[in-house]
Regions:
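Elongated, amphipathic alpha-helical interaction scaffolds
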Residues: 1-286
Length: 286
């Protein structure tokens, strides 16, 4: 088993770019098979990755393109991805994330060859997303599975399947003895904490009891020594920070313009003889 050195500077497998590089490594087939088997709860024998490479300069579409699209021995389609950066949302319902998620899942399912194929013979499609931030705040479970069901929980079909793994909800797993962890919990802890020196002992204990995670750890060490990958991560982080900074600046400018406009409206109403109480009601000011 390849333990991670206690002082090693390990790149985070929770970074969407590193996640894809790890799972598509020529020596990572057993790793990918085991992750898919654990997540969809099936004994997967073989997996074939389908090409969906990201253009070198296509940084802006990373959340849509840094996925691992593959088929398994049953013929079913599986798309695996990592979301490391929170998407911009209006409100707290993550509607943008979920709608995009459903859009690409149904697009993948409908991409099957249907000519001269009986609909009952269409294969299943799985969308698996590991996420570094919480999408479903109403549940404490870190794994949530979705398919088409009625409001009474009667399943219509298992043709399309959504599985969301929220890596920010692993507190219970962190408190368990390693020997009591499920394979799903072990993989999730590895993907979330492999890069953190404070959790290195835990990760190495997990590596000792699961061979495929040991293989992933060895590959992750190899990837972490690649200066090209480190440069790409630095470049992407700078880009993301610039994006956040520009967004924050735009928000501040918008707030300033809003305050200026509000003051102008109040002055006009005062000039027309309205009282402050009347103005508060008109402008819905508390």
């Amino acid at each position: 088993m390849s333990k991670l050195p206690m002082d090693a500077d390990i790149l985070p497998p929770s970074d969407d770019r590193i996640f894809k590089v790890l799972l598509t490594h020529p020596d990572a087939k057993r790793v990918l098979i085991d992750i898919i088997s654990v997540v969809i709860d099936q004994n997967v024998i073989d997996v074939k990755i389908r090409g969906n490479e990201v253009p070198v300069m296509d940084i802006d579409e990373k959340n849509e393109r840094f996925d691992v699209n593959c088929t398994i021995d049953s013929g079913d389609q599986v798309d695996v991805e990592m979301h490391s950066c929170r998407q911009a949302e209006i409100g707290s319902e993550h509607t943008n994330f979920i709608n995009k998620y459903v859009y690409f899942l149904t697009d993948l399912h409908s991409s099957q060859k249907s000519k001269k194929v009986i609909y009952r013979n269409l294969v299943k499609t799985y969308q698996i997303t590991f996420c570094m931030y919480n999408i479903l705040p109403s549940t404490a479970d870190f794994v949530n599975r979705f398919s088409l069901r009625t409001e009474n929980n009667l399943q219509l079909t298992d043709q399309i399947n959504i599985i969301i793994i929220e890596l920010g909800k692993l507190n219970k797993a962190l408190k368990k003895p390693v020997e009591e962890l499920t394979s799903f919990e072990k993989w999730s802890l590895f993907l979330r904490y492999a890069q953190e020196p404070m959790q290195r002992k835990l990760i190495n204990d997990i590596i000792k009891c699961k061979e495929e995670i040991g293989m992933a750890a060895a590959l992750l060490q190899e990837i972490s020594q690649d200066e090209h990958e480190r440069a790409r991560i630095r470049s992407r982080k700078m880009y993301e920070m610039d994006q956040y900074s520009n967004l924050h600046t735009s928000e501040l400018r918008g707030e300033a313009k809003g305050r200026e406009k509000g003051r102008g409206e109040i002055i006009k109403l005062l000039e027309k003889g309205y009282s402050l109480e009347e103005i508060k009601k008109m402008l819905e000011i508390n």
